[in-house]
A protein has these predicted regions:
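Rieske [2Fe-2S] iron-sulfur-binding domain
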Residues: 2-9, 15-21, 26-27, 33, ...
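C-terminal catalytic domain of Rieske-type non-heme iron oxygenases
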Residues: 3-5, 71, 148-357
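Short, charged, low-hydrophobicity "junction" segments
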Residues: 10-11, 251
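Non-catalytic accessory segments flanking enzyme active sites
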Residues: 27-28, 33-35, 195-197, 207
Length: 357
């Protein structure tokens, strides 16, 4: 598969959950992300060879750094000595030296050296959280576990990110909205007939519909029962170690050969008020059709796709933070209710485990 990355605004490490779980109440987990699964972190090209990148993810501070050979590491952005930010320090190739006192932490979260006191008992101890990482589809993915589940959950990547007959473009953006609202928006196909009615790909079809939930081995479909292949008519929520959605929307003839385009979507919590969204826009095309699709996307279609995303961003960012506390839902919202209950149940279970563990 070929993937290009657009933005708007390696080596596997040993896991280490050194974060302080005392703040992980059910409400906190619901707002900043459940644990014990993988999340997309950022586009791979955000961290070039020899580079560092400071990030907030799931309400916590992290540091990515890449070695000259391309291998990638992620550390909690906290020096084990006095708690200073490692992201203020110096990249030493295979480790980070804290700016405050020079303490060196390698990619596994282990203290490699204490220059001010050689032989110090901190040396050789793994004291900094260092999540497992992989890179796929032009993005970095990380596993966020808790003390009871430090080893990464089994991960099955979306087939659209690994299939050689799929050509995709990664679109990345950061939105000032809670991550759950971004996920719920994807589980709400009917908004396409209204919010996106004037877009290049969602102007056709009925503005009335009935929906159903259809279970799958990896999640569930939420789909219209009276229309298919006309508009944003279905979405599948997939839980394969990482949560993602798949959907397809018909292209007009002006989009060239290759049939409908699909979207693999993910939302990663930054904190309770912000999220990072990842949308791989893909098409199953080969040979000259692949070349045509990629040319048309870059020259014509990309801006139109960003226009649709901008409509979503505006709508979601204008939602009140407590919008879900005063709703009057109806049949079209079955997908929203399903995913909301799913995450609430998992947040409560993980909070109980943190308390009893």
């Amino acid at each position: 598969m070929t993937t290009d990355t657009a933005t708007h605004t390696g080596e596997t490490t040993r896991p280490s959950e050194v974060a302080r779980p005392g703040n992980r109440t059910a409400d906190r987990l619901f707002d900043t992300g459940i644990r014990n699964q993988w999340y997309a972190v950022c586009p791979s090209d955000f961290v070039p060879a020899g580079g560092m990148k400071r990030l907030t993810l799931l309400g916590e501070e992290w540091l990515l750094f890449r070695r000259a050979d391309g291998s990638l590491h992620m550390l909690e952005d906290r020096c084990p000595h006095r708690g200073a930010r490692l992201s203020l320090g110096k990249h030493l190739g295979d480790r980070i030296a804290c700016w405050y006192h020079g303490v060196q932490v390698d990619g596994t979260g282990t203290v490699a050296a204490v220059p001010g006191l050689p032989g110090c008992n901190l040396e050789g101890k793994q004291l900094v959280a260092a999540p497992h990482l992989i890179e796929a589809g032009g993005a970095i993915l990380a596993y966020f576990g808790d003390n009871e589940h430090p080893e990464p959950a089994p991960l099955v990547l979306p087939e659209q990110l690994t299939d050689p007959d799929v050509s995709a473009f990664l679109c990345y953006a950061e939105w000032n909205v809670n991550w759950r609202y971004a996920v719920e928006n994807l589980l709400d196909p009917m908004h396409g007939s209204f919010l996106h009615r004037d877009s290049h790909s969602m102007s056709e079809g009925q503005t009335t519909a009935r929906f159903r939930i259809r279970e799958t081995e990896r999640g569930f479909f939420f789909e219209k029962t009276d229309q298919s292949g006309v508009n944003f008519d279905w979405v599948e929520l997939c839980r394969t170690g990482i949560d993602w959605v798949d959907l397809t929307i018909p292209y007009p003839p002006t989009a060239g050969p290759g049939g409908p385009f699909g979207i693999v979507g993910m939302a990663t919590p930054i904190d309770e008020d912000r999220c990072a969204v990842f949308f791989w826009r893909y098409r199953r095309v080969t040979d000259w059709q692949r070349d045509t699709w990629r040319f048309l996307y870059r020259t014509v279609l990309e801006d139109r796709h960003w226009d649709v995303l901008e409509q979503d961003r505006i709508m979601l960012e204008e939602l009140r933070s407590d919008a879900d506390q005063a709703e009057n839902l109806y049949q079209h919202d079955l997908g929203v209710v399903r995913v909301r209950r799913m995450y609430r149940t998992e947040a409560e279970a993980q909070a109980r485990a943190n308390t009893t563990g």
